[in-house]
A protein has these predicted regions:
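Structured all-alpha helical bundle cores of eukaryotic regulatory proteins
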Residues: 1-164
């Protein structure tokens, strides 16, 4: 179910034209919340849009409004439900909304090795694939970022740009 939710949130993220950091923070909020709270399957979409609402407020200059999330869920949830879920999520997470994202690490690593745009875009794609896969949660964000950049370089057969 997590993979289906994340896949749908990627589509929502694209529809709203949000920055990549918002998507990565959204997934982090979902995973940290679900570590602390058991949720029934039919409420998982609510958790997802709530996390994206919070992440948008943190990362975006112009965040989507609550009504946008009501619309995107085809009115499965009302404005008050989303706002109530936002309060509950923030309390459960002790208002800790920031995190070290694999995307942030990737940006830093790519600038260090002076990665060309094609390789960087491929690494971003590989990193986005890791968001959907539950097994990737056990890996540190810096490891996911370096692995995606390394793999992107190998796919295009670029010599190893990593310092020894």
């Amino acid at each position: 179910m997590r993979a289906i939710l994340i896949d749908w949130l990627v589509e929502v993220h694209l529809k709203f034209k949000l920055v990549p950091e918002t998507l990565y923070l959204t997934v982090s909020l979902i995973d940290r919340f679900l570590e602390k709270e058991t949720i029934m399957r039919e409420r998982l979409q609510l958790v997802g849009v709530t996390a994206m609402l919070i992440a948008s407020k943190v990362e975006e200059i112009y965040a989507p409004e609550v009504q946008d999330f009501v619309y995107i869920t085809d009115r499965a949830y009302q404005r008050e439900e989303i706002l109530d879920a936002e309060r509950k999520m923030l309390v459960k997470l002790d208002f800790q909304t920031s995190h070290f994202s694999s995307y942030g690490f990737l940006q830093r690593y790519a600038s260090l090795v002076d990665s060309d745009p094609f390789i960087l875009n491929m690494a971003r794609y590989l990193l986005e694939l890791s968001l959907v896969e539950y097994k990737m949660l056990k890996h540190h964000p810096s490891m996911l970022a370096s692995a995606s950049l390394y793999l992107a370089q190998k796919i295009v057969r670029k010599p190893n740009a990593w310092p020894e």
